[in-house]
């Protein structure tokens, strides 16, 4: 499977994909707005094959911690800051939605890769 095909899959699922340059290779930055309007993105780091790219997306899903991410968007009183929703529950739900967006991207990639 070609990397260009994987980029098209992401773009057809509302992701914006940007190429990134690293000292040890190229990677991709996947960006998309969360339901609450956060400009959410994940970076793959360098990869050399479609399989490595898919594994990188899976790893981002495994490592994503919605609770920790939500905490970053809360002030010292537990309310949203920097444009995040005011209520803690809403911030957490938005971060959980971001986690699901990563998972859904991985599933699209896995399914497409297995069909090839």
Region locations from a protein language model:
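Intrinsically disordered, low-complexity regulatory regions enriched in serine/threonine/proline
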Residues: 39-116
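Negatively charged, low-complexity tracts enriched in Asp/Glu with abundant Ser/Thr
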Residues: 1-39, 114-116
């Amino acid at each position: 499977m070609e990397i260009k095909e994987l980029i098209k899959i992401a773009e057809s699922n509302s992701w914006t994909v940007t190429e990134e340059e690293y000292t040890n290779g190229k990677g991709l930055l996947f960006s998309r707005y969360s339901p609450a309007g956060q400009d959410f993105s994940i970076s793959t780091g360098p990869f050399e094959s479609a399989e490595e790219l898919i594994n990188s997306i899976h790893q981002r899903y495994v490592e994503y911690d919605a609770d920790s991410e939500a905490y970053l968007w809360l002030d010292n009183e537990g309310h949203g800051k920097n444009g995040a929703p005011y209520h803690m529950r809403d911030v957490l739900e938005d971060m959980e939605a971001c986690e699901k967006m990563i998972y859904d991207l991985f599933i699209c990639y896995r399914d497409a890769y297995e069909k090839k």
